[in-house]
């Protein structure tokens, strides 16, 4: 969406670097396993206000008016098909099979054409290559601030083939006839439980720490134009309180995934059942909880991602140089939260800001974080599907503003040199002729 929007504004020298193979970008046809998006079908904004590019128009053209009217959420694989169509239709400049190794200020060794360049070190087809760019946008999704991670006390205790994170590429056919334990209560937990049940798992026990599943989805309350458009202008104290609230009050699993899991007689959900100890007996996975012991053949941890900028190779130069919330805001003593404090403190247009003003300020502010790094600064929905309609224009304004201001020093000289004629007249037109010379008529000049 960003690349398409930039093109409409005349920014055409762009490249979208993606590690995945063509058509496999993102999570939708890889480890996302829900039957449908949890975002209501009307809350998406990749169409740039052009109805012909909307998912609604695409869906109706492919499946018909009745099919669109019958759904309230878009099926996941249909959404991925729409994204493939969107990319092909707009001929977006995606370069696949590229792994970004580092984003850093360009040096003399990079032979940068200007001092304001960013160097992007990449690996493609086994060969290193450094690309130069005036600006860089990080669009690395939910794990762009760290890594999907299995709790260490589980990962360290089990053979690798007996334990997976819900974001892993799991061969569910291998779970046929097995006892499967799932840790977590969110969308990924129930989606993976359903996938295991469909694959013929003997039993699936889903365990979670909370005393009861959330019923209310607080995310729906902030999916409005005012918040999604102007969230970054809120005072720091309010943004901090909102982020803190969402750390305490989680959203429920999607209704469809929950209902599908509960239809299976060999599925059980266990509230207030955190895993206290996990052991490998040589044959079984022995899990100790406050509700007793469980024995599994395989476990899936739907435990989300850890904030860990050091886990992202592309952030190795950026992470030490950027401002964090702990550098710019001190919450009341009863609102402290070390994870939120470690998030980057971003500018209004998602630009990174220097930890120490005046040091590294130019190159750092040329990097925009349109991913989970923006969670505290721009809100929990900013870079999700429901936020695109409002967030993408703000991001694009920041990019074009920076490109324009970079060229401000050329404005006056360019203006003074501008000499494109709009009216084609003889050079001597308007010069008072001698008395003996007739005045040319306008008709003769036409």
Regions found by a protein language model. Name each.
Residues 46-80:
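A conserved beta-strand/loop capping segment in the N-terminal third of enzymes
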Residues 5, 19, 35-46, 54, ...:
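Long, low-complexity, intrinsically disordered N-terminal extensions of eukaryotic proteins, enriched
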Residues 1-20, 68-199, 203-446:
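Flavin (primarily FAD) cofactor-binding/catalytic cores of flavoenzymes
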Residues 24-29, 58, 85, 309:
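Tryptophan-centered motif/residue detector
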Residues 29, 35, 53, 57, ...:
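Flexible, active-site-adjacent loop/turn segments at secondary-structure boundaries
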């Amino acid at each position: 969406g960003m690349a398409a929007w930039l093109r409409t504004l005349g920014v055409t020298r762009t490249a979208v670097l993606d590690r995945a193979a063509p058509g496999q970008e993102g999570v939708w046809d890889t480890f996302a396993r829900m039957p449908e998006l949890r975002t209501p079908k009307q809350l998406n904004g990749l169409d740039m206000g052009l109805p012909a590019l909307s998912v609604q128009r695409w869906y109706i053209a492919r499946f018909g008016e009745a099919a669109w009217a019958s759904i309230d959420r878009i099926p996941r694989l249909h959404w991925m098909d729409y994204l493939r169509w969107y990319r092909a239709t707009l001929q977006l400049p995606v370069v696949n099979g590229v792994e970004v190794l580092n984003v850093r200020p360009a040096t003399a060794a990079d032979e940068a054409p200007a001092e304001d360049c960013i160097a992007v070190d990449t690996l493609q087809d086994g060969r290193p290559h450094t690309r130069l760019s005036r600006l860089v946008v990080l669009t690395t999704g939910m794990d762009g601030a760290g890594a999907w991670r299995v709790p260490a006390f589980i990962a360290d205790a089990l053979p690798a083939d007996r334990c997976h994170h819900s974001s892993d590429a799991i061969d569910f056919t291998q779970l046929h006839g097995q006892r499967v334990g799932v840790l977590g209560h969110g969308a990924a937990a129930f989606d993976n439980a359903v996938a295991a049940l469909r694959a013929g798992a003997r039993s699936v026990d889903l365990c979670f720490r909370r005393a009861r599943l959330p019923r209310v989805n607080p995310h729906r309350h902030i999916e409005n134009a005012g918040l999604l458009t102007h969230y970054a202008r809120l005072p720091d104290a309010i943004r901090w309180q909102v982020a803190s609230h969402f750390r305490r009050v989680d959203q429920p699993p999607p209704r469809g995934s929950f209902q599908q899991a509960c239809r299976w007689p060999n599925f059980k959900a266990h509230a207030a059942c955190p895993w206290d100890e996990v052991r490998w007996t040589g044959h079984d996975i022995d899990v100790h909880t406050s509700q007793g012991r469980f024995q599994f053949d395989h476990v899936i941890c739907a435990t989300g991602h850890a904030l860990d900028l050091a886990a992202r190779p592309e952030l190795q130069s950026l992470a030490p140089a950027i401002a964090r919330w702990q550098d710019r805001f001190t919450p009341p003593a009863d609102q402290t939260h070390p994870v939120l404090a470690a998030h980057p403190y971003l500018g209004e247009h998602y630009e990174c800001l220097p930890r120490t003003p005046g040091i590294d300020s130019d190159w750092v502010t040329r990097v925009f974080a349109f991913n989970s790094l923006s969670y505290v600064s721009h809100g929990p929905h900013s870079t999700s599907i429901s936020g695109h309609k409002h967030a993408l224009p703000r991001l694009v304004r920041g990019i074009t503003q920076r490109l324009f201001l970079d060229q401000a020093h050329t404005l006056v000289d360019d203006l003074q040199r501008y000499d494109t004629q709009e009216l084609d007249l003889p050079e001597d037109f308007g010069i008072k002729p001698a008395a003996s010379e007739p005045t040319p008529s306008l008709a003769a000049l036409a």
